[in-house]
């Protein structure tokens, strides 16, 4: 079972958000929250809030146990770009692209390895 949360049109470039998401992907939820609290990036509070939202969705909508969840997926896609212009010398202008992100976090139950799957992995 899995639950997800999506934040759309967040005014941080996806390239910068991905740096933070890479830190928490595959981690247990408690560990991911601890990492986000100590990460000094502008997107950390946004990602932390989104992770808490995914946890609330898991608990409320699916009656999942929060203590046994891991961050299954975490990705940032590009949202709409705000195009602005900066005046330059001699009447020219330079384009400024203010990029936005659509951030998605999926939490799921830990996969418990059974002895059968372990035997199959050892056989490979």
Swiss-Prot record:
GO cellular component terms given for this protein: cytosolic large ribosomal subunit
Molecular functions (GO terms): rRNA binding; structural constituent of ribosome
Entry keyword annotation includes Glycosyltransferase: no
UniProt feature coiled coil, ranges: none
UniProt-listed Gene3D superfamilies: Ribosomal protein L22/L17
SUPFAM superfamilies from the UniProt entry: Ribosomal protein L22
A Gene Ontology biological process term: translation
Keyword Ion transport on entry: no
Family matches, as PANTHER family: CHLOROPLAST 50S RIBOSOMAL PROTEIN L22-RELATED (PTHR13501), LARGE RIBOSOMAL SUBUNIT PROTEIN UL22M (PTHR13501:SF8)
Homology family: Belongs to the universal ribosomal protein uL22 family.
Oligomeric and partner information: Part of the 50S ribosomal subunit.
Function description: This protein binds specifically to 23S rRNA; its binding is stimulated by other ribosomal proteins, e.g. L4, L17, and L20. It is important during the early stages of 50S assembly. It makes multiple contacts with different domains of the 23S rRNA in the assembled 50S subunit and ribosome.
Protein name: Large ribosomal subunit protein uL22
Organism: Macrococcus caseolyticus (strain JCSC5402)
Species lineage: Bacteria, Bacillati, Bacillota, Bacilli, Bacillales
Gene name tied to this protein: rplV
């Amino acid at each position: 079972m899995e639950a997800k949360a999506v934040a759309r049109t967040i005014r941080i470039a996806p390239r910068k958000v991905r740096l933070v998401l890479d830190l928490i992907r595959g981690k247990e939820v408690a560990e991911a929250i601890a990492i986000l609290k100590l990460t000094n990036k502008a997107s950390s509070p946004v990602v932390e809030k989104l992770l808490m939202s995914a946890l609330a969705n898991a608990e409320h909508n699916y009656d999942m146990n929060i203590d046994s969840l891991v961050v299954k997926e975490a990705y940032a896609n590009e949202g709409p770009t705000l195009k602005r212009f900066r005046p330059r010398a001699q009447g020219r202008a330079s384009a400024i692209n203010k990029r936005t992100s659509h951030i998605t976090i999926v939490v799921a139950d830990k996969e418990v390895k059974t002895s059968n799957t372990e035997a199959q992995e050892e056989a490979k």
